[in-house]
Amino acid sequence: MADKSDLGYTGLTDEQAQELHSVYMSGLWLFSAVAIVAHLAVYIWRPWF
């Protein structure tokens, strides 16, 4: 277990916080890619301007 002085205000160690951040960013990139593909598909199907 991490010592109290090693924990940030979130209760995570620096290593855990970096791992959580990398997982979060991977999910954000995946969500963004799916959203872009969906918008392009809808625009090709029915342009909105």
UniProtKB/Swiss-Prot annotation:
Residues the entry annotates as binding a bacteriochlorophyll: H21, H39
Topological type in the membrane: Single-pass type II membrane protein
Pfam families according to UniProt: LHC
Cellular location(s): Cell inner membrane
GO MF annotation, one: electron transporter, transferring electrons within the cyclic electron transport pathway of photosynthesis activity
Topological domains annotated Periplasmic: 46-49
Keywords recorded for this protein, A-Z: Antenna complex, Bacteriochlorophyll, Cell inner membrane, Cell membrane, Chlorophyll, Chromophore, Light-harvesting polypeptide, Magnesium, Membrane, Metal-binding, Signal-anchor, Transmembrane, Transmembrane helix
Family annotation (InterPro entries): Antenna_a/b, Antenna_beta_CS, Antenna_beta_dom_sf, LHB-1/5, Light-harvesting_complex
Cytoplasmic topological domain: 2-27
Stored Gene3D superfamilies: 1.20.5.250
Residues in the signal sequence: none
GO cellular component: plasma membrane; plasma membrane light-harvesting complex
Assembly and oligomerization: The core complex is formed by different alpha and beta chains, binding bacteriochlorophyll molecules, and arranged most probably in tetrameric structures disposed around the reaction center. The non-pigmented gamma chains may constitute additional components.
NCBIfam families in alphabetical order: pufB_517_ASD
Functional note: Antenna complexes are light-harvesting systems, which transfer the excitation energy to the reaction centers.
Name of this protein: Light-harvesting protein B-875 beta chain
